[in-house]
Amino acid sequence: MIFDEIVNDAYEEREYPALLALAHEWSGTRPFRALRLLVATPVFRNTLLEYRALIAGGADLVVGVAGLDSGEEGAGADASNAGAGMPCDPGIVDVVRENGIPVVGLQEALEMEAAGRGFDLILDCAGQFSACHPRFGFVELTRSGVQFYEKCEHPVYVADSGIVKRIETCLGTGEGYVRALAQLGHDFCSDSGADGAGKEFVVFGSGKVGQGIVLQLLRSGASVHVVTDCSLGSNPFLDANGVPVTDCNDLDAVASLVRGADFVVTATGVKGALDRPQVVEALLGSHAVLANMGVEDEYGPGVPTSRVLAEKKPLNFILEEPTHLKYIDASLALHAALGELLLQEGGAVYGKEGADSPAANKKAGPMDPPSELEQRILSMTMQDGLIGAEIAEMMGW
């Protein structure tokens, strides 16, 4: 299989049971045969496993990287900033090209469409290629990308809408934040045995990513305080772990927390979430180590890029592997499998049969993944992977 040397040197098969199962299945069924697929998953070593499964299924693969070319503003106001500056590993981008797979930015993708060489399906991330017009629709990997598809005329499955994505965000992303801090010298939360007790963390956001960060920090022995929108109701996870919570609209209290923090990390998924004068002033006057774990700049323009680790990009992307493959395998498998489902629903089982218009039997715009498909991928991950016990703990089983 393509990329075998890199994959076999870096991973054991139990780290990617779901993608391995899809690759084996699709090598026989070839659901993507003669179809052009653009995949915009952030390009890192573990992403090669998703490419490999799709290629096994017969896909004519094109890899998309936002910002690769200039002139992105021509895509239109709604999509022009989607996924801007999405991190990638330049070395892996080179590997992809060396294996004969085209790598394009948004402008080149639009030019391909204009020249009659458009895409049958786009597996997107953070709405990077939402300005395109794939025949059978999109699959969006992240919650932050959904905003770019709210008025989309094509069907859009959102891989972040269900249970599978919790494996990546609750277990993998939080662990990636901790690893990144350790790589930068904050060894209190690495596997070195150092203790995080006494370090004060303020986590903005209590969704899947925020909860995952809190979980990892609690395991390290750190003191954690969460800032979130309390009008949304109580959070069972935070309540069960005795994590103190402050409402994001109580600006005096938030500013006080920031001033006393050793570390501040954002995980709200909202651009400019901390862009309040009182909070910005507290951040600029604080000694805290600032980091962002969202795709968007959650600090806003009032906080200089240089004041935040990794220049406001998601901190785990400084790592060779931002999220360990064992935690992201199920998400990438769902991303790809939802693509197969769109083709089936649009009448394209093999080749390019089916209607010229996008999947007429499906509504346009964002849709949740079917629970049956998620359960299938979850079963693969728990039965054949390395993290079954961690998933069971996360789910409270």
Model region roles, listed by residue range:
Residues V43-A59:
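Histidine-anchored nucleotide/phosphate-binding helix
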Residues M1-F32, D69-G74, N81-C88, V93-G196:
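Glycine/serine-rich phosphate-binding loop and adjoining beta1-alpha1 elements at the start
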Residues A115-G116, G196, A255-R259, L283-L284:
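A short, aliphatic-rich alpha-helical micro-motif
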Residues F3-L19, F44, V158-D191, V289-W397:
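Adenosine-phosphate binding glycine-rich loop
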Residues A222-R259, V264-K271:
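Adenosine-nucleotide cofactor-binding segment
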Residues D124, R135-S144, F263-K271, R276-V308:
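ADP-ribose/adenylate-binding Rossmann-like module
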Residues A34-T47, C189-L218:
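Glycine-rich adenosine-cofactor-binding loop
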Residues V63-E73, G85-I92, S220-N241:
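NAD(P)-binding Rossmann-fold cofactor-contacting core
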